[in-house]
Regions:
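Anionic-ligand binding patches
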Residues: 1-136
């Protein structure tokens, strides 16, 4: 992005889901998505979201590299609920095969951490970085 004063900033963010040491990226197909949700239901898992910001200001570069962990507790789900969710929503582009901001929210018992990081971008922290650098 070009900042009004002519400086530049690049923002990147990505997310993975981890349960019992197994990494759940984006599912490769419908069956993989069902497998992931069956593993995640009825238990706690971690969502890791990275945030990388590079700011060029007057020829100098500032870098911010951070990782956020949020614990998500998913209610027990029936197989029919999992299949319905997978068949109704585009889950193939979501780490762990779910989007917390979709209908899947009804299956969330609670979370400990940053909701926006689970969605994919820790926006509050990004705002702080921009504010600190007088971009916002």
């Amino acid at each position: 992005m070009i900042i009004p004063n002519g400086d530049r900033a690049v923002v990147g963010s990505d997310t993975i889901v981890v349960k019992d040491g197994e990494v759940f990226g984006k599912p490769k197909d419908r069956e993989d998505a069902i497998r992931m949700l069956k593993a995640l239901q009825g238990a706690r898992h971690s969502v890791y979201t990275s945030l990388s910001v590079i700011i060029e200001e007057k020829g100098k570069v500032k870098e911010y590299k951070e990782v956020y962990e949020t614990y998500v507790y998913v209610k027990p789900m029936e197989d029919s609920e999992i299949i319905n969710y997978v068949d109704t929503y585009n889950v193939l582009d979501k780490a762990g095969a779910y989007a917390i901001q979709s209908k899947f929210a009804v299956y969330i018992e609670r979370l400990d951490g940053d909701y926006n990081a689970i969605v994919g971008l820790p926006i509050s922290r990004l705002y702080d970085i921009f504010k600190e650098n007088e971009i916002w």
